[in-house]
Regions:
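Substrate-binding cleft and catalytic face of glycoside hydrolase catalytic domains
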Residues: 45-245
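C-terminal beta-strand-rich structural cap/linker in extracellular carbohydrate-active enzymes
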Residues: 449-523
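Mature N-terminal, pre-catalytic/accessory segment of carbohydrate-active enzymes
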Residues: 1-48, 486, 496-523
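Aromatic/acidic polysaccharide-binding cleft in carbohydrate-active enzymes
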Residues: 275-406
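Conserved, mostly hydrophobic/aromatic
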Residues: 20, 85, 137, 155, ...
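Short, acidic/polar
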Residues: 28-42, 205-213, 301-307
Length: 523
C-alpha cells in the first residue's frame, strides 16, 4: 500500500518534456505525409519546437557556385519547411549541418553515418565561407519572419562532432573553428539570436565547450547534447565499472550535465537534450541502433514514462528522436514496424511511445508526490499532480532488459483529497493490444504489407484501455487499486463528481407553438 503525500514544495509538472520533438532530416519535412504525421502529433501532444538534421545537405539545394565561382544561395526549400512547421505551431530548432559540397572544394568527400544518405562531413575549404553561409541564412530568416520571431528560435551548431562518423576532424576543430565561425555569424545578424552546442553524443564535452567559449569570448546561449539508454553499454563493457545503478544511467547522465553547467563559468545556460529515444540493451556484445525493437513495442511506453519523470527537472528541453517512421537516414522503413524510431509508424499508427507521451501530456499542476527507485520494486514508479481539485496519477512497471522475469505490480494507493464525498475515477492503460499495437502485428505474423482491415485492426489496437469507476466515496482519502504487468503504464484521474447533467428544457409556450406548427403541417 502506498499513501501519497501532498507536498507543495515539489514544484509544478513542467513542460520540459514537451518543448521539443525531432524529425530525421530537413528534406523529409518537404513530404506531405511527414507534415500530416506532425499534425497528428501536434493535435494531441503540442510540442513547441522541432529539430532535424541536414539543413545544409545538398538535397536542400541551399548553395552552389555561380559561373564566376562565387557562392549563390537559395532558401526556397528551407522557407517551405519553416512555413509548414509554423503552421503546425512548431518553431524551428535549427541544427546547422551538414557541409554543402560547394564549400568543400576539390577533395575526396567524406560521408557520415549512414553513408547512403550522402551527408558530407568534410571541413570547409575556407571557414570564412562556412561563416558566410550561416550569416546569409540567418539574415534571410530575419528578413522573412522578423527578428521578434526568429529570436525565439534556436541555432545549434552541427550534430555529434565527438563522433568520427559525423565530424572526422575531431573536437579540437569543432571548438576552435566550426563552432566559433558559425556562432559569430549568427550574432553578426543580431546579438538577440540564440546559438549553442556542442550537440555531442552521450553528454560529453559540455564543460570543455563552455570553458572554451568563455576563455575565447565565443558566443553561447545554450548547451545541447544527446543520450540514449543503450549508451551505458557503449561506454562500459557489460556495465563493468559503470557508476550507475541498474536502470539509472539515463537520468544519471542528465544529472552530470546539469552539474557540469551549474559548476561552470556560465551556470545559467539553458540545457537542451536534442536527441533521445527508448533504444535499450542488455549486453555490449550486441549493440544495435537500427534493429532495436524497444522503439516499437510496449517496452517503449514504460521507458518513456520512467525516463521523462526522472529528468523533467534537470533540463530545459528533451527531444524524442523521432516523430515518425518516415525516416530515411538509414533507408526508408520497409515494413509496418521496422525498429524505426518514430512515435508513429509509416501508416501514422500510434505506438506505445506516442500513448506514453499522451498520458504525460495529461499530467499538470502542482506535483503532489513522486516515488521510485529504492522505495518500490525495481523498474516501478508513480507520480501524482493536482490542479483545481483534480488529481492525476501516472504509474509504470518497466521491465529492464537485464531482468528476465518482471513481477506484476499489484498496488493499492491512498490519495488525499480536499473534500469528502463522491468522486469518479477514470483510468487509461497501455498494455499489449491496447495502446501498443506492435504485439498485435506480431500476432498477425508480422506481415510486411497489410490490408485495409488489418490496418484498421492495428489502429484499434493502438487505442488505450479505458475504464471508469463512476462513484468512489471519500473520507479525506480516495483508495485506488491497480495491477500492472511488465512494461504496462496506467494513468488515473480522480475528480469530485459534478452535478448531474440537466435535461433539455422547453417552455410550455414553446411546446405549444411547436405542436401548433406540427398540426398545421399535417393539414
Amino acid at each position: 500500500m502506498i499513501e501519497l503525500k501532498k507536498n507543495n514544495k515539489n514544484g509544478r509538472f513542467g513542460n520540459t518534456i514537451f518543448k521539443s520533438i525531432a524529425v530525421g532530416s530537413a528534406y523529409e519535412l518537404l513530404r506531405k505525409d511527414t507534415i500530416d504525421h506532425l499534425a497528428v502529433i501536434q493535435n494531441e501532444l503540442h510540442f513547441k519546437y522541432c529539430r532535424f538534421h541536414g539543413l545544409f545537405h545538398d538535397d536542400m539545394a541551399v548553395v552552389r557556385r555561380d559561373q564566376n565561382g562565387n557562392l549563390a544561395f537559395q532558401w526556397h526549400h528551407i522557407d517551405k519547411i519553416t512555413d509548414s512547421l509554423l503552421s503546425l505551431g512548431l518553431k524551428p530548432f535549427f541544427e546547422l549541418s551538414s557541409m554543402p559540397k560547394a564549400l568543400v572544394g576539390d577533395v575526396e568527400l567524406k560521408y557520415g553515418f549512414p553513408a547512403g544518405w550522402k551527408m558530407i562531413t568534410n571541413e570547409p575549404e575556407d571557414y570564412n565561407e562556412w561563416g558566410k553561409l550561416v550569416e546569409r541564412f540567418v539574415s534571410h530568416l530575419v528578413d522573412r519572419y522578423g527578428l521578434d520571431e526568429v529570436k525565439t528560435w534556436y541555432f545549434e551548431v552541427w550534430n555529434e562532432p565527438n563522433l568520427k562518423g559525423f565530424w572526422p576532424a575531431g573536437m579540437e576543430a569543432y571548438l576552435e573553428k566550426l563552432y566559433p565561425y558559425a556562432a559569430f555569424a549568427v550574432k553578426k545578424v543580431s546579438n538577440e539570436l540564440k546559438v549553442g552546442g556542442p550537440a555531442t553524443a552521450g553528454g560529453e564535452f559540455v564543460a570543455e565547450f563552455i570553458e572554451n567559449c568563455c576563455k575565447n569570448n565565443i558566443p553561447v546561449d545554450f548547451v545541447s547534447t544527446h543520450a540514449y539508454p543503450i549508451g551505458e553499454y557503449c561506454e562500459y563493457d557489460e556495465r563493468v565499472g559503470s557508476p550507475y545503478k541498474l536502470g539509472e544511467y539515463f537520468s544519471g547522465r542528465f544529472k552530470e550535465v546539469e552539474d557540469a553547467v551549474a559548476n561552470s563559468s556560465m551556470p545559467n545556460l539553458e540545457i537542451h537534450w536534442t536527441e533521445w529515444n527508448t533504444q535499450s540493451g542488455n549486453t555490449s556484445k550486441n549493440i544495435t541502433w537500427t534493429m532495436n525493437p524497444t522503439v516499437d513495442s510496449h517496452f517503449g511506453g514504460a521507458c518513456v514514462v520512467k525516463n521523462m519523470l526522472s529528468i523533467m527537472d534537470k533540463c530545459d528541453s528533451v527531444a524524442y528522436w523521432v516523430a515518425s517512421d518516415i525516416f530515411s537516414e538509414a533507408g526508408q522503413a520497409h515494413s509496418v514496424f521496422s525498429c524505426t524510431y518514430g512515435l508513429l509508424n509509416i501508416q501514422g499508427i500510434k505506438k506505445a511511445t506516442f500513448n506514453a507521451y499522451k498520458l504525460l501530456r495529461n499530467m499538470r499542476g502542482g506535483i503532489m508526490d513522486c516515488i521510485n527507485g529504492d522505495k518500490l520494486m525495481l523498474g516501478c514508479g508513480i507520480c501524482a499532480a493536482e490542479e483545481n481539485g483534480v488529481i492525476r496519477i501516472i504509474a509504470y512497471n518497466q521491465q529492464l532488459l537485464e531482468i528476465e522475469n518482471q513481477p506484476d505490480w499489484n498496488e493499492s494507493i491512498i490519495v488525499p483529497v480536499d473534500e469528502d464525498g463522491d468522486y469518479s475515477v477514470t483510468t487509461a492503460k497501455i498494455e499489449k493490444g491496447h495502446g501498443s499495437c506492435y504485439e498485435t502485428w506480431v500476432d498477425m505474423g508480422a506481415p510486411q504489407n497489410i490490408s485495409k482491415i488489418q490496418e484498421e485492426a492495428l489502429r484499434y489496437a493502438g487505442m488505450m484501455n479505458y475504464g471508469i469507476q463512476p462513484k468512489v466515496s471519500a473520507d479525506k482519502f480516495v483508495n485506488v487499486e491497480f495491477n500492472l504487468k511488465a512494461d504496462e503504464v496506467i494513468y488515473i484521474e480522480i475528480q469530485k463528481k459534478d452535478i448531474k447533467a440537466l435535461p433539455r428544457v422547453i417552455s410550455d409556450e414553446d411546446m405549444k407553438l411547436l405542436n401548433d406548427n406540427l398540426m398545421l403541417a399535417k393539414k
